[in-house]
Amino acid sequence: MLRLLFIVRLLFLMPLASSRSNHSEEVENLLKLKSTFGETKSDDVFKTWTHRNSACEFAGIVCNSDGNVVEINLGSRSLINRDDDGRFTDLPFDSICDLKLLEKLVLGNNSLRGQIGTNLGKCNRLRYLDLGINNFSGEFPAIDSLQLLEFLSLNASGISGIFPWSSLKDLKRLSFLSVGDNRFGSHPFPREILNLTALQWVYLSNSSITGKIPEGIKNLVRLQNLELSDNQISGEIPKEIVQLKNLRQLEIYSNDLTGKLPLGFRNLTNLRNFDASNNSLEGDLSELRFLKNLVSLGMFENRLTGEIPKEFGDFKSLAALSLYRNQLTGKLPRRLGSWTAFKYIDVSENFLEGQIPPYMCKKGVMTHLLMLQNRFTGQFPESYAKCKTLIRLRVSNNSLSGMIPSGIWGLPNLQFLDLASNYFEGNLTGDIGNAKSLGSLDLSNNRFSGSLPFQISGANSLVSVNLRMNKFSGIVPESFGKLKELSSLILDQNNLSGAIPKSLGLCTSLVDLNFAGNSLSEEIPESLGSLKLLNSLNLSGNKLSGMIPVGLSALKLSLLDLSNNQLTGSVPESLVSGSFEGNSGLCSSKIRYLRPCPLGKPHSQGKRKHLSKVDMCFIVAAILALFFLFSYVIFKIRRDKLNKTVQKKNDWQVSSFRLLNFNEMEIIDEIKSENIIGRGGQGNVYKVSLRSGETLAVKHIWCPESSHESFRSSTAMLSDGNNRSNNGEFEAEVATLSNIKHINVVKLFCSITCEDSKLLVYEYMPNGSLWEQLHERRGEQEIGWRVRQALALGAAKGLEYLHHGLDRPVIHRDVKSSNILLDEEWRPRIADFGLAKIIQADSVQRDFSAPLVKGTLGYIAPEYAYTTKVNEKSDVYSFGVVLMELVTGKKPLETDFGENNDIVMWVWSVSKETNREMMMKLIDTSIEDEYKEDALKVLTIALLCTDKSPQARPFMKSVVSMLEKIEPSYNKNSGEASYGESANDEITKVV
């Protein structure tokens, strides 16, 4: 009996012992996973991961009722798979998959690296797998063994190469598939997924899909979300897509789709979000009139015709409508946007007519009302005067009329108000003073009248005011002088009277001032002479009297028009290039259409005094003759030696953007071959030393056809021949740089132009370029890592400013180390904007077509090879190359990289091996050992920047943020000074 009881007890304890053994193995497997991460900022996650606890007590672990691990959830924990020695290691999928009952594995939204490996296929109980938003490399393994898988998220995971679509064909339970935003090679739509009829969500955007959407898409009848944007999909939208009646979201924007919306598209009545923008679709929108559940509709930049369906006015969920740049006609539905929290409408650049719907801000959340360049008529609705959430209101170039509701002027969040080129009338009321966010006010070409409100000074964010071609009367308020940010004030062609406010001299940012065609009187205020940035001054067609202020002579104006006034006295010699017609009281010996200034009347004097004056005149004449003779001899010698004469000062036009303490002839005389400090595809750069001791850099823009031999004469150096082909490039650089003020962007003082030459005058950078310091002075001096890190961050901030800090983003198009200059304190400055492209402010699609490949070999982004559409991400790629130069010390093109390789391919090829030691070998040997860990972090950022896919590259804002987060290694465990020390301090220690 006792023996029987013993056997029964033994049989009872055996499963318990087995269970304890299994649980112990699970703990060991999880601790092996933990060891992969080493010391991490997410140590809190692993505090409970110790031998003292069971696996079920580990944070992020879920067990079943038997105590077996069924879920690992470590998503969004900032995890990096780097061991205690700092080496990157592959995740131990063999240990993970030894958890035999594991059903859910979530490691998404971390910073995991390395290859995923074939051991993943051993997790054959998995139902849910999320590895998305990481930095993995290499190809994804076949997962045909994961027959129970229902959820697969790999988007933006870093995987590349050929995706194993064939291994998905038998995953019949798969309902969620997200593999977009990865660097796959070009491939057609994966037909293997067309038989996975359980699919409800498919995200394949930005995954290099080419060709057509197959007819077999009709098989996925349970689909609720289909996203195929940012690919190279062509052909028509297949008619079979209308069978996907459960679709709630369809995004196919930024492809090459053509044709019309297929018949039967109306059957997709569950559709809430539909975006087919930036394609070449045609036809009308009639198929959409039955989709009453739409929340967001985007079809901008297509070739759509016909009317906007009136049924849109009854859609009770529609909150965003973007149809700009099509050929749509007819009227907008009156009740459009009245049923829900409508936020956004852009129907600009169509042929729409009728009245503006009045109820789009009924719920009080609307931010954008954009309807410019149509044929709208009628009054602007009163209802929008209460729309306090509006940020941009643009209805210019229509046929609208009537009065603007006074509340519009004072909307507190409005940044851009554009009512130009309509038939509006009435007053600009004092409510404008409440528009604290308003930066641009354009009321030009309307019928507004009344006086200008003095309260406008309350709108102290104003940068641009354009009220031209209206019927405003009365005086120009002195309160304009309080607008410190004002850059452009255009009031021409009105009925303004009185004096020009002296207070305008306080608007020190003014560049453009136009009061032409009014009835302004009295004298031109002397205070205008203090506007050192003023570039254009037009006061023509008024009743101004008195003399031209001497202070205007100091300004470097590209346009000065004082014609048709009542001015008297002589025209200052430095202003003779301006326009002064219609001023009978003006005189000048150098302006042919003005009478000569009188020399003075002779007075009756004694003979002796008369003779004395004659003698004096004779002496002065003799001195002048000798002077001119001497000058002629010197001039002839120089001409014989240099083969050309110096151009006359009056031939030059100077446009200044900052306070100048030099004149143009000081610059021109120094344009000599011996002063050349740089040569480029756009022209030479000269070092110019002024009499004041200041040093400047002058860039001479040349045309491609002109010869660039080593001339000796300053005039020969400036001779460009037929340079009309260069005007666009020169004007692009001036327009860009004149508006830029940033510590990490080179400062432009002025431009100097004449009929056959163009000069740009910059601040001089005494430490040359980053290229010179890295590649041409090795052996003489080595730049330490702290300096390199400071240079990387500073240059990134400069480029971030160009992309994100201006009203209109600027694409540099030639970012390279030789265009990053170093000032006397070793601060980096982005330079050379001859290739810059300013993107139009109101374009949502910010790509542009480049007629020719621009840039420098080794820095050119790969998308130039297959498209003419480039954007800021092309600059990001080039900046990534610069980061690689900083870390490796290598040039972008070197024989060490092998045939047909460059620095990007070289670094990427090593990074795919996921061997930390190999990555460390990429780092410049001159970088101190204690900083190599930080250098490796910067190299990781460089890899992100040089991703083959433009969409996968970060924006410069993100690049700056990542660089700022790199905590210097030397400061982690010591009391040394923080990274905030200037690079100049460090250069004295290292160089």
Curated annotation (Swiss-Prot):
GO terms for cellular component: membrane. The chain crosses the membrane at residues 617-637. Residues 972-991 are annotated as: Disordered. Residues 1-19 form the signal peptide. Glycans are attached at N22, N109, N135, N155, N195, N206, N267, N278, N397, N427, N495, N538. Residues 638-991 are cytoplasmic. It is found in: Membrane. It catalyses: L-seryl-[protein] + ATP = O-phospho-L-seryl-[protein] + ADP + H(+); L-threonyl-[protein] + ATP = O-phospho-L-threonyl-[protein] + ADP + H(+). Modulates the seed size by negatively regulating the cellularization of syncytial endosperm. Belongs to the protein kinase superfamily. Ser/Thr protein kinase family. This is Receptor-like protein kinase HAIKU2.
